[in-house]
Each structure stands twice: as C-alpha cells, then as structure tokens.
Amino acid sequence: MSNIIKALEDEQLKQDLPKFAPGDTVVVQVKVKEGDRERLQAFEGVVIAIRNRGLHSAFTVRKISNGEGVERTFQTHSPVVNSIEVKRRGAVRRAKLYYLRERSGKSARIKEKLAKK
C-alpha cells in the first residue's frame, strides 16, 4: 500500500525547483485568483526556515513591508507556487533564522555567501 502512495507522491513532485537554503533572498511567484481571472504576485524576502518532507515540504519567507515584518509559508510543491528565483545567497550558520523576528535595521542584515573558486 505504501508503495502506491509513494508512487503517487513522486508523480506530483516539482522537478524544476532551484536549490535554496535559509538566508537566501528569493522571489516566489504566487498564483492569485481575483474573481474569474488569475495573475502572478511576487513575494520577495529572506528564507528563514525550510521543512523537508517530500511532497509536504514547505519554506517560510520573511520580508519587511511598510516597516512591518511579514512572513509567509509556502508549500514547495504546491500548484499555487509558480516559480522560485534565488536573488542572492546568504551566509548563515543556522537552519532556522527565527532570531531575525526580533531584529530590525542593520542587525537584521545577512552577509552574502561568496562563490567558491
């Protein structure tokens, strides 16, 4: 029975996702339905958490909008998520960056990861 479930889940996994990690700045294109029409809405921010659970994987993106912190959790393989683009790589030493919630201004900045030679 579990082989059937695994086969169905593998079928629904997205294959075209870029590799991203906590600390990276990403732009998530989200499909938004307004009445009878559908459009794409960009949500740009820092990835503060990733949850790897196969088809049920999720990630949380945080941004500052009008001086207010906004966090949004996306299901990685959801049809609502159209695309994910990595803008810059962040150099962090934690898997969960929840400490950024208490920080503001310059202390909330993340160093950029330098490319390996």
UniProtKB/Swiss-Prot annotation:
GO terms for cellular component: cytosolic large ribosomal subunit. One of its GO terms (biological process) is translation. It comes from the Bacteria. InterPro entries: Ribosomal_bL19, Ribosomal_bL19_CS, Ribosomal_bL19_sf, Translation_prot_SH3-like_sf. Keywords: Ribonucleoprotein, Ribosomal protein. One of its GO terms (molecular function) is structural constituent of ribosome. Transmembrane segments: none annotated. Coiled coil: none annotated. Belongs to the bacterial ribosomal protein bL19 family. This protein is located at the 30S-50S ribosomal subunit interface and may play a role in the structure and function of the aminoacyl-tRNA binding site. This is Large ribosomal subunit protein bL19.
